[in-house]
Amino acid sequence: MKKRASVRKICDKCRLIRRGGRILVICSNPRHKQGQG
């Protein structure tokens, strides 16, 4: 999980979701997991 100031989709399978006020990117590729903060 990478923590970034700006999260964005890297590939077509990346999904932006909001969980508990935080923005996360979940993907089938574990390298694409990102969290904001």
Swiss-Prot record:
<comment type="similarity">
    <text>Belongs to the bacterial ribosomal protein bL36 family.</text>
</comment>
<dbReference type="InterPro" id="IPR000473">
    <property type="entry name" value="Ribosomal_bL36"/>
</dbReference>
<dbReference type="GO" id="GO:0003735">
    <property type="term" value="F:structural constituent of ribosome"/>
</dbReference>
<dbReference type="InterPro" id="IPR035977">
    <property type="entry name" value="Ribosomal_bL36_sp"/>
</dbReference>
<dbReference type="GO" id="GO:0005840">
    <property type="term" value="C:ribosome"/>
</dbReference>
<dbReference type="GO" id="GO:0006412">
    <property type="term" value="P:translation"/>
</dbReference>
<keyword id="KW-0934">Plastid</keyword>
<dbReference type="Pfam" id="PF00444">
    <property type="entry name" value="Ribosomal_L36"/>
</dbReference>
<dbReference type="GO" id="GO:1990904">
    <property type="term" value="C:ribonucleoprotein complex"/>
</dbReference>
<dbReference type="GO" id="GO:0009536">
    <property type="term" value="C:plastid"/>
</dbReference>
<keyword id="KW-0689">Ribosomal protein</keyword>
<keyword id="KW-0687">Ribonucleoprotein</keyword>
<protein>
    <recommendedName>
        <fullName>Large ribosomal subunit protein bL36c</fullName>
    </recommendedName>
</protein>
